[in-house]
Structure formats: structure tokens, C-alpha cells
Amino acid sequence: TFASQRHLWLTVNAEPRFSERWGTRAELILRRAEEGRTWQQVQFRVAPVWNPRRDLQVSVGYLFSRTFPYGRFPVRRVFNEHRLYQQLVLRSALGRFAVAHRYRVEQRWSRPASATEPGRYTSVFTNRARYQARAMLPLAGQVAATPGPYTAVSTEVFVSFGAQVGRNVFDQFRAYGGCGWQLTKAAGIELGYLQQINQQSNGTNFERNHTAQLTFNINPN
């Protein structure tokens, strides 16, 4: 069963650097469902960041997530998730395109409402692997990450694994396209459209989420 839904996501990314190789990353994500009328999710991510080379970034971080009932296949109650993750980003140039490959492994602890005991929560631990490919093209002839307009596309695949994974091993697929403006070397804004295919834990219900996404990037050095 497929449910088609419309969402609004707002993301604020900050990645200040303390030195040529070391920095930190903080990310706040506010997700609204049903064309913005109800809450879907709130997430906060923080991680130290190591840049051993210009084309390589390594980070190990923590994410807190709060999920609300929404849409055709709502969760039973609001619940929280705590997540650790390890991430590797490889960057390269393909002509005028700036290309990034992001590999992420997550360990997820959540407490959704019990399916068999009303009023009780169950503890669930799962692992998830994610791969994202993103390409960015400057539109005014500028070098990537310097002021000016640009366009970007990306795809991302999510695969769950572990003893407590339900029937949604596939988990998610995302495809994104958008345009942005690098305001300064340290700040930019991006607006785009994201289509998300999200498989539910029963393995038979799928969300097809059409999402307008607004992102603010802040990268002070």
C-alpha cells in the first residue's frame, strides 16, 4: 500500500572549523507533515569533524530524534530515538561539477509504543547503512563554495540490518533536486524538492513523501 503525502522540512547546518583539519558539525532539522499542518519529526545532530585531506572528511557523532504521529501510517505515540553514527565523505571534481560521496553507518536506539501492550514502550536497537551521492554545479562560472548561484542533485539509499529489524530492510530511498545561493564563503541557502520512498516496518506499507526542503548552511572558519 502506497500513501502519497506532502511535507515541509527546514534544516540549519553549522560546521565551524577550529584549525585546517579539525572542526565540528551541528545540524537542526524541523520536519512538518500534511503540508506543514502537523509535526513529523525534530532532529538534532552534533559531531567532531576531521579533514585529513581536502577531499576527505571523517566524523563520529550523535543524533537525537523525536517522532510524532502523522500521515496514513502514524506511529502509536510520540517517541524518541538516540543514534550514534560514523561517517566518511569523499569529494571530487567532475568538470565544473563538485561531487560528494557520503557513507554513513548508524546505531539506533528507539522506544516506540508496544504493538501488543497499550501504554507500554518497547526498546528497539537496529543498525542502518546509508549512501548518498550529490553533485553541485555553479551557475555563474564561479568555483564551487564561492559566492553565487548553483544547482544540486542527490540520491540516497538506506538499508537496515540487525536482529531487531522488521520487514523493512530496504528502509528508504531519497531523490533530490534544488537550487541555492552561496551568499558568502561562510553562508548559503538552498531550496529544493525531495521525493522520499519510506518502507514501514511491516514491509507492505510505503510512504511516497513529496517534500519541499529549505536549508541554511553556516560554515565559519
Regions found by a protein language model. Give the residues of each.
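Residues that define the transmembrane beta-barrel architecture of outer-membrane proteins
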Residues: 6-8, 40-42, 80-84, 123-131, ...
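Transmembrane beta-strands of outer-membrane beta-barrel proteins
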Residues: 9-13, 23-29, 57-63, 100-108, ...
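Residues on the lipid-exposed face of transmembrane beta-strands in outer-membrane beta-barrel proteins
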Residues: 12-16, 46-50, 86-90, 131-141, ...
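Short loop/turn motifs that connect adjacent beta-strands in outer-membrane beta-barrel proteins
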Residues: 20-21, 55, 93-100, 139-149, ...
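Transmembrane beta-strands of outer-membrane beta-barrel pores
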Residues: 28-34, 62-68, 92-94, 105-109, ...
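Extracellular loop and loop/strand-boundary signature of outer-membrane beta-barrel proteins
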Residues: 30-34, 71-75, 116-123, 162-165, ...
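Gram-negative (and chloroplast) outer-membrane scaffold detector with strong preference
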Residues: 47-70, 74-111, 126-137
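Outer-membrane beta-barrel transmembrane domain signature
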Residues: 103-190, 194-197
